[in-house]
Amino acid sequence: MPKRTDIKSILILGAGPIVIGQACEFDYSGAQACKALREEGYRVILVNSNPATIMTDPAMADATYIEPIKWATVAKIIEKERPDALLPTMGGQTALNCALDLERHGVLEKFGVEMIGANADTIDKAEDRSRFDKAMKDIGLACPRSGIAHSMEEAYGVLEQVGFPCIIRPSFTMGGTGGGIAYNREEFEEICARGLDLSPTNELLIDESLIGWKEYEMEVVRDKKDNCIIVCSIENFDPMGVHTGDSITVAPAQTLTDKEYQIMRNASLAVLREIGVETGGSNVQFGICPNTGRMVVIEMNPRVSRSSALASKATGFPIAKIAAKLAVGYTLDELQNDITGGRTPASFEPAIDYVVTKIPRFAFEKFPKADARLTTQMKSVGEVMAIGRTFQESVQKALRGLEVGATGFDPKLDLNDPEADSILKRELTVPSAERVWYVADAFRAGKSVEEVFELTRIDEWFLVQIEDLVKDEEKVKTLGLSSIDRELMYKLKRKGFSDARLAKLLGVTEKNLRSHRHKLKVLPVYKRVDTCAAEFATDTAYMYSTYEEECEANPSSREKIMILGGGPNRIGQGIEFDYCCVHAALAMREDGYETIMVNCNPETVSTDYDTSDRLYFEPVTLEDVLEIVRVEQPKGVIVQYGGQTPLKLCRALEEAGVPIIGTSPDAIDRAEDRERFQQMVQRLNLRQPANATARSEDEALAASKAIGYPLVVRPSYVLGGRAMEIVYQEEELKRYMREAVQVSNDSPVLLDHFLNCAIEVDIDAVCDGEIVVIGAIMQHIEQAGVHSGDSACSLPPYSLPQHIQDEIREQVKKMALELGVVGLMNVQMAVQGEDIFVIEVNPRASRTVPFVSKCVGESLAKVAARVMAGKTLAEVGFTQEIIPPFFSVKEAVFPFAKFPGVDPILGPEMKSTGEVMGVGDSFAEAFAKAQLGASEILPTAGCAFISVREDDKPFAAQVAGDLVALGFEVVATAGTARVIEAAGLPVRRVNKVTEGRPHVVDMIKNDEVTLIINTTEGRQSIADSYSIRRNALQHKICCTTTIAGGQAICEALKFGPEKTVRRLQDLHAGIKA
């Protein structure tokens, strides 16, 4: 069946902001779908609220709406654009749920829109647990024993059939949100209550526990003619009980017999047919009991998922692209496989002659109160993938690509510790982010494979592989560097040992080890990912390293630019940096360079095989980058675009003679090194908050007397504000110095005077060494003290006087020229009245670059890449700051709901995982839309609770006045209430949590409050009001922890409900006019 001609335009729903369980893999799939459908001549309309994505670039679709993915908003877009079809399978759970809402509210029927790729009934059958269970029974497949509950009463009924331990999962949520494992009645009650609340249909599935079973996934693609292929089988290294997004996974499956594999393959095809997935990709998850071999179907996703992004990168088969084409009527045998240059059709199942390992990346250091144990609710924020010829090689490459300080299986445990044995038992039995290292420690401690298997239930095949690596390490420890000959070195490198790990074992430097290895002529070769196990030739340069005879890299002699990516997503370094890397690659390719991308994150667009000319899927570490440079000999390497990951390498790369283009490593150091930066600020006669550096507790206490409290304290060289705190008195400073000095490895702790009530400003600029052009000035809505990545911001500024803005522009230009910036630069400043303070300067791509590019209609990342490659800003044609005639607001999205016990308060340490953007003619409209996009539902009436710190009291009356005028009842604690009463406004007093009951938390629990404005100062007041914020989160009450946030909410409420939707392309045309 060739493509359908009865549909002309297709609406694609994106996934919205990045949250735990739904990361940038949906930018990758959405961008692919846009490309594939436009290639076929369809008009593509895209909705996505996340500005940091490639898919929302104006060139990706015919009409782009950066609007909230809520059915009412999408209905307005459908009314305006009149698409013929809706493709809901590219935007994760968000898009599926929105599509079902549109169907339920009759919007699709009203405007005659057909759902393609999956229909409402299919989605419902796969997602609705009781229908899914029944469907599996109909085709003779077993599901875990289970029951459905819509209330606590029903839940107890199911419990009687299933027994403890049991697994609880809410329907229509993703990443296992709200679910968990219950071992007793108390836990059962808590998890069920949370799950019923979080499921949009108030429905729970309660399953028998399969903990310790082996878990597998099949990635399947099916077309209209019932052709099916398995793209990839994936095996979870961690057994059942850990969410598959948090498990280490390996492809292809390693421990299945051929017979088992065929049974599972047939079962997964039967599942797709029964559920009714006519076209596109799905993944089916299975559990197998290691003792009896009983196989059960756990679940299936009738959409492109995180696993399909992994399967696409693992095999080179572009699932999302193929799925989009199947949705418009093609069949698999009609589509070509790009990687083999069309030598094979898409109906050939990929064959792979290597092993892929994925390891998740967690961010528990950001949430010290969170439970770091892994269960059925997903907690990881990113992942890294590695390719090797064996499991040993690929797992060791993945471990070093994670960037958690490991160079391989580094020991975690001091084996001489008297507690060592009990720590080991606990760490092996209860899975955590670090379990895989403890497995290696268990073998060092002399445990047998059988013992470790009993504790972990990790398949013995994997355990034997790790035990073998530990034995190799023990052997290396007994040798000296000179006694390692070519044969042994070759054997160790084939098993994936990194230079850094071997150097540590031998007690030499990594540099010494590398030169010894080069002397022995032990060098990696590069193999291609070609979907066909080298059976057909391939023109696509998608490479991984290994130690063998034949190298398939075949580098060209063209001028090349190499871009280092950002590695795994984490809080503080996410999709924004990937966006910059992709734009750099596009710009360099347009200018005739051959582009080389180095990255190891399988979720991203940067690791797509056609984003750059050559892709090296390798860890972004010194060893791996230097080897690629040796083979490719690039003209220039870009390190400023991937966040802190490549920046950390720039000094060492420069020493090794790698040509780093753009801002010099020395200039980067001048901006990052505190003392050198201070000298520059003084030379330019600019102002910084009073500050000092301290290397010990005594120095810190002395400095604090000179500077005065409150203080911001932090270690030097960090991204995302790790281990940063605001302290208000000496006791807090002492405690911080005892806990934080370990973070700094001999580098000092920095103390800054904290600017209370200051307005924070973010500036992005581009410089070519001669002239500086401001990309944008953004005013933060939260005052200084909230990390810039967590603060909402407005472009253009909404209340910053013009003369202050002009002064900021001048100061930024001075600093850019003084530092000799070539490329992008980001500056953070604070404004207190007429005083402007420089807080920090980052001569690199910042996380606001994508947002700014969407607002001003010019890709700063592309402009800056061209400047780095040697053009002037005049030659690029970007010489004038663009100030848009509309307002854009960026709002951050947080993962607090996933971490019970974590305080949802904003401070100097970054906690957000993603962002959304709202656009309006006024600041109020843009802010209101951004809140909606972030799923913060602003209340329109009810009772507002206000309790603010001393410094905010002058503003409390104004906010209260606004709320009263909008029809709210205002309640406040005693001190705040006095201020409001003094202004002649009606207010009801309520007890603080420490003042006896009934107090404010009782009101929150009884759902008597609809809006909370609660600002704090100092450790004690934060601790006292913790239960207010946590309960507000659990009861889904709009809550802000800054007075400026309260003022902005009042502005948005005055604006009233959102009325218009705007096309990005029209907004940009309006700027150019």
Curated annotation (Swiss-Prot):
Keyword ATP-binding: yes
Residues that bind Mg(2+) 4: E840, N842
Binding site for ATP 1: R129, R169, G175, G176, E208, L210, E215, G241, V242, H243, Q285, E299
Cited PROSITE patterns: ATP_GRASP (PS50975), CPSASE_1 (PS00866), CPSASE_2 (PS00867), MGS (PS51855)
Region annotated Carboxyphosphate synthetic domain, chain positions: 2-403
Residue numbers binding ATP 2: R714, H753, L755, E760, G785, V786, H787, S788, Q828, E840
Binding site for Mn(2+) 3: Q828, E840
Family: Belongs to the CarB family.
Binding residues for Mn(2+) 1: Q285, E299
Entry note: cofactor: Binds 4 Mg(2+) or Mn(2+) ions per subunit.
SUPFAM superfamilies, per the entry: Carbamoyl phosphate synthetase, large subunit connection domain (SSF48108), Glutathione synthetase ATP-binding domain-like (SSF56059), Methylglyoxal synthase-like (SSF52335), PreATP-grasp domain (SSF52440)
Chain residues that bind Mg(2+) 2: E299, N301
Domain named MGS-like: residues: 936-1073
Residues in ATP-grasp domain copies: 133-328, 678-869
Database matches in CDD domains: MGS_CPS_II
Protein name: Carbamoyl phosphate synthase large chain
Enzyme Commission (EC) number: 6.3.4.16, 6.3.5.5
Organism: Pseudomonas aeruginosa (strain ATCC 15692 / DSM 22644 / CIP 104116 / JCM 14847 / LMG 12228 / 1C / PRS 101 / PAO1)
The keyword Ligase is annotated on this UniProt entry: yes
Pathway annotation: Amino-acid biosynthesis; L-arginine biosynthesis; carbamoyl phosphate from bicarbonate: step 1/1; Pyrimidine metabolism; UMP biosynthesis via de novo pathway; (S)-dihydroorotate from bicarbonate: step 1/3
